[in-house]
């Protein structure tokens, strides 16, 4: 505090101004600039006092709503000053829909619960519809007609403010289905506004006019497609004609447009998680468009490296262009350069699409082609793979995204390229799968309603935090300044991607299993380890079979000729970084649990070759490195803290046979309290089956080495499951079987006989021992 005489000397302010009473320098790292001025002489002390003020928190229930009340008791520094009253704030935690609408239109909400309106408008589609919400708002306003005029005017002004904010931030909510309720609101607002005579009517008239323009929109002129249906398919190997940076710019242009058109509320777990249910095919169109573009890029990578074009849906309806391994290596290097350019453009969506496609089963098994790739390309590919590692819940990609938003230069530390000019702009396109996973996990971990039926609005606040981050990134995405290249876009539109069966068949024709020379046995080959969170990114209902982890079975066993399978088995305890996918889960995947074959090989640990096949869902087990003749042992799910004991919940992936409809895979959240019957019932409900017949089914865990672990009917699934895998199978009980539940090494879930897989019989173990001895000595 400055002495009083000095303060009087410094008082040069006009009458009514503020006198500088104290000064305190501040650290620029703490914000506030290089220095800080304190006006009034007690602000810094008050801030320190507020931090030490005791806090009391409790819940209050009032008119169908539960509020969380936070009270702070501040103590004055001067003991002679009387104790001020405590400062309290209320946040709505849960309530009925009517109570939420009352709180929304309450004039006190904007001052005490600041984030309520934004969170409510962003997440209301998860628990109600727009017409229902507009109807409740009209009911609330009409109920206040008998109240004093000033209260009605204040509430009407709040309603106009809410509708204006709603229209500005979520215009997509006002479709034709809301027309009836808008007519009702228009009649009330205009009547009340003109009667009040204080300008409310004019504001409401402008608002209704804007709402009408959204309800009856004019059909926009759709751009004409560059590639017409009758045009011949594009040659996927023409990717070599385009410059890598030009192709990356066009991919970024398409991804940025889709991301800007993304409606964040459609990413909510309550909507995205129900998209496959009957009658819900219209849900989340903006998210589906982003997923389709992701799969289109991945399909272009697979088709071009294989040199194949689909001419139909059948496995044999493919046109293959003969390519030698060095030529395929040039295609691999080309796509790696494209991914690097996308990384420089901060287009993480296309980076992940290219990387995941190069890690897919049909591509990463092409050892001859990868062996011809240059060392620099493999180094770049390895660094790109590390960005999307699932370690610590994608911590690397999350931190990198935050850093890239702050930085102006999009260069990687290892990149030798000079910064681009500012002509391309400085936007960012994130990988949407990370946000979808967060929202689906929030939806699975928290209940929609409390025990008394109140809407759990605390859950909606957490979801709103993720949606706000998406909104912020959309604003950053507007920084791009890219021009379309019709030649590249026409080529992308003209590609006809291969189906999963086609891509695997072509890959095996290009390099038959066991025909290519194996890599030198000088490094251990870690097995693939897949995290349990990928299924939450899930399918969109449209099969896109380009990027998956299915492992088709080979015709029979083949004898190894090198020690590589031995080294593979010795290294299976090591964890290899993996990435998840944002692609469609297949409706039918009969080969998911078939034995691993030489087409599903992991790369050496010290080599940046693709680490494993791309997967569409989590917990699909560890693909077994090596040939089908080797039974994989060891741990299939490595890494410290990755077993069931690492947390109190796990996401398991359950396959259910649906007869002629094939197989479907669902993710189920299993907690430490869940018993087998409840898990089986939830799986049946997710597959639209009657949960009353749960007693007729059994839950079987699929373990590495084609082993099975039958979960007893009375067992706790969380503690009974083996940490080596998160793959499960739901099947009808075998009435004629008398075997006790437990681990078996017989046929797998796909019905493969033990002789075709990796059975644990003594003759097979003995034969394997002889192979190991020959390999070592």
UniProtKB/Swiss-Prot annotation:
MF terms (GO), sorted A to Z: guanyl-nucleotide exchange factor activity
Domain N-terminal Ras-GEF: 88-212
A GO term from the CC aspect: cytosol
SMART domains, per the entry: RA, RasGEF, RasGEFN
Annotated segments matching region Disordered: 1-54, 581-644, 734-766
Role this protein plays: Probable guanine nucleotide exchange factor. Putative effector of Ras and/or Rap. Associates with the GTP-bound form of Rap 1A and H-Ras in vitro.
Protein name (Swiss-Prot/TrEMBL): Ral guanine nucleotide dissociation stimulator-like 2
């Amino acid at each position: 505090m400055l002495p009083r005489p000095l303060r009087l000397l410094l008082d040069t302010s006009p009458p009514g101004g503020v006198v500088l009473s104290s000064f305190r320098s501040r650290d620029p790292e703490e914000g506030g600039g290089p220095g800080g001025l304190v006006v009034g002489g007690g602000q810094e002390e008050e801030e320190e006092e507020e931090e030490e003020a005791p806090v009391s928190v409790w819940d209050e229930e009032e008119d169908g709503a539960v509020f969380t009340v936070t009270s702070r008791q501040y103590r004055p520094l001067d003991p002679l000053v009387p104790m001020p009253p405590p400062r309290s704030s209320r946040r709505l935690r849960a309530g009925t829909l009517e109570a939420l609408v009352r709180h929304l239109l309450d004039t006190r909400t904007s001052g005490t619960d600041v984030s309520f309106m934004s969170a409510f408008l962003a997440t209301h589609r998860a628990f109600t519809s727009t017409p229902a919400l507009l109807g409740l708002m009209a009911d609330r306003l009409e109920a206040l007609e008998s109240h004093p005029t000033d209260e009605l005017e204040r509430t009407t002004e709040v309603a106009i403010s809410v509708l204006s904010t709603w229209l500005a931030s979520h215009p997509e909510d006002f479709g034709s289905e809301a027309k009836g309720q808008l007519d009702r609101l228009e009649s009330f607002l205009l009547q009340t506004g003109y009667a009040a005579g204080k300008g409310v009517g004019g504001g409401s008239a402008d608002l209704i006019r804007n709402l009408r323009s959204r309800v009856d929109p004019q059909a926009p002129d759709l751009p004409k497609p560059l590639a017409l249906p009758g045009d011949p398919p594009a040659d996927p190997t023409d990717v070599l004609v385009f410059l890598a940076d030009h192709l990356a710019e066009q991919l970024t242009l398409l991804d940025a447009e889709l991301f800007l058109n993304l409606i964040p509320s459609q990413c909510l777990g309550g909507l995205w998680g129900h998209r496959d249910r009957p009658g819900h095919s219209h849900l989340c169109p903006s998210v589906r468009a982003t997923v389709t573009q992701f799969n289109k890029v991945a399909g272009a990578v697979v088709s071009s490296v294989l040199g194949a074009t689909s001419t139909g849906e059948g496995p044999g309806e493919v046109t293959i262009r003969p390519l030698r391994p060095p030529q395929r290596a040039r295609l691999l290097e080309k796509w790696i350069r494209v991914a690097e350019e996308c990384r420089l453009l901060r287009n993480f969506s296309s980076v992940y699409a290219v990387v995941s496609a190069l890690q897919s089963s049909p591509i990463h098994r092409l050892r001859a082609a990868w062996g011809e790739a240059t060392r620099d390309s493999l180094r770049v590919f390895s660094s790109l793979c590390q960005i999307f590692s699932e370690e610590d819940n994608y911590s690397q990609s999350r931190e990198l995204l935050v850093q890239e938003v702050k930085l102006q230069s999009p260069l990687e530390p290892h990149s030798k390229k000079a910064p681009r000019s500012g002509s391309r702009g400085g936007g960012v396109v994130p990988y949407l799968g990370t946000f979808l996973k967060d929202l689906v996990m929030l939806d699975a971990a928290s209940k929609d309603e409390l025990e008394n039926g109140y809407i759990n609005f605390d859950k909606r606040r957490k979801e709103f935090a993720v949606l706000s981050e998406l909104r912020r990134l959309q604003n950053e995405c507007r920084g791009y300044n890219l021009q379309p290249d019709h030649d590249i876009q026409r080529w992308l539109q003209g590609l006809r991607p291969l189906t999963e069966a086609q891509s695997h068949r072509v890959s095996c024709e290009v390099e038959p299993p066991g025909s290519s020379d194996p890599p030198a046995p000088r490094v251990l080959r870690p097995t693939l380890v897949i995290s349990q969170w990928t299924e939450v990114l899930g399918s969109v209902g449209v099969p896109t079979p380009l990027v998956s982890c299915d492992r088709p079975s080979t015709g029979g066993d083949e004898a190894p000729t090198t020690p590589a399978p031995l080294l593979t088995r010795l290294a299976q305890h090591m964890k290899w970084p993996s990435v998840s996918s944002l692609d469609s889960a297949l409706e039918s995947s009969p080969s998911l649990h078939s034995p691993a074959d030489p087409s599903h090989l992991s790369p050496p640990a010290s080599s940046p070759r693709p680490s494993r096949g791309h997967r569409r869902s989590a917990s699909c087990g560890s693909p077994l490195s090596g040939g089908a003749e080797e039974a994989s042992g060891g741990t299939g799910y490595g890494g410290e803290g990755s077993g069931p004991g690492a947390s109190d919940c796990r996401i398991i992936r359950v396959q259910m046979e649906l007869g002629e409809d094939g197989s479907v895979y669902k993710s189920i959240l299993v907690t430490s309290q869940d018993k087998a019957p409840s898990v089986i019932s939830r799986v049946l409900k997710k597959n639209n089956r009657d949960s009353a017949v749960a007693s007729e089914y059994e839950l079987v865990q699929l373990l590495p080495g084609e082993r099975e672990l039958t979960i007893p009917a009375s067992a706790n699934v969380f503690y009974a499951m083996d940490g080596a895998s998160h793959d499960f199978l739901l099947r009808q009980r075998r009435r004629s079987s008398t075997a006790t539940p437990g681990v078996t090494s017989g046929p797998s879930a796909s019905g493969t006989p033990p002789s075709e897989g990796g059975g644990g019989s003594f003759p097979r173990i003995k034969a394997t021992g002889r192979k190991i001895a020959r390999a070592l000595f």
